[in-house]
């Protein structure tokens, strides 16, 4: 899309192209001095979940499948804006899932890490709590074009409404 736009314009234009995650991570970099080192790597996330599962004595048939499913549920909770108290896990008892969710969040927080879902959650929180920062980004991006708008999730939609 960026190349097509540049070819049609035949000149440099002050237009930013990026995914939600790329744009929101850039915002968080400015606000919190994050770098790529602050993004939790897949192996860090899986190792964290292995430790939580062992600590909670959870049973499963296939470890990788179980962890993937739990991380998927954590992602669903973050992306939909559901309160953790109102979410019912498909993988384990609700009280256990809440512990897993909380411990996963604590691991990220203690290690100053964020996952891709946090990029959305933290940007939304930042904009809601800091009107000055929201205004600065509104001035930078006067217009937003979202490709495949029908595919965005709740938190992406909520952030767009803040603009």
Show the residue positions of the predicted features.
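Conserved P-loop NTPase-based nucleic-acid remodeling module centered on helicase motor cores
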Residues: 1-72
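Generic alpha-helix detector with strongest preference for long hydrophobic helices that associate
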Residues: 5-13, 29-30, 51-55, 85, ...
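Short, flexible active-site loop motifs that bind/organize anionic cofactors or intermediates
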Residues: 13, 35, 39, 60, ...
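Conserved helicase NTPase motor core
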Residues: 16, 91-163
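Weak global preference for isoleucine
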Residues: 27, 39, 52-53, 67, ...
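A short secondary-structure junction motif
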Residues: 27-31, 77, 81, 126, ...
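Coupling/switch/interface segments within P-loop NTPase motor domains and analogous charged loops
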Residues: 42-114
């Amino acid at each position: 899309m960026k190349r097509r736009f540049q070819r049609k314009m035949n000149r440099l234009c002050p237009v930013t192209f990026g995914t939600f995650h790329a744009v929101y991570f850039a915002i968080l970099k400015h606000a919190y001095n994050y770098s790529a080192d602050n993004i939790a790597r897949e192996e860090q996330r899986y190792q964290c979940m292995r430790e939580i599962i062992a600590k909670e004595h959870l049973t499963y048939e296939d470890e990788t499948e179980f962890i993937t499913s739990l991380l998927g549920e954590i992602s669903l909770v973050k992306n939909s804006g559901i309160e953790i108290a109102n979410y019912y896990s498909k993988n384990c008892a609700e009280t256990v899932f809440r512990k897993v969710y909380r411990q996963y969040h604590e691991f990220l927080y203690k290690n100053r890490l964020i996952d891709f879902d946090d990029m959305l959650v933290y940007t939304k929180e930042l904009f809601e709590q800091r009107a000055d920062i929201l205004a600065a980004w509104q001035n930078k991006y006067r217009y937003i074009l979202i490709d495949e708008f029908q595919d965005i999730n709740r938190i992406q939609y909520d952030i767009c409404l803040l603009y």
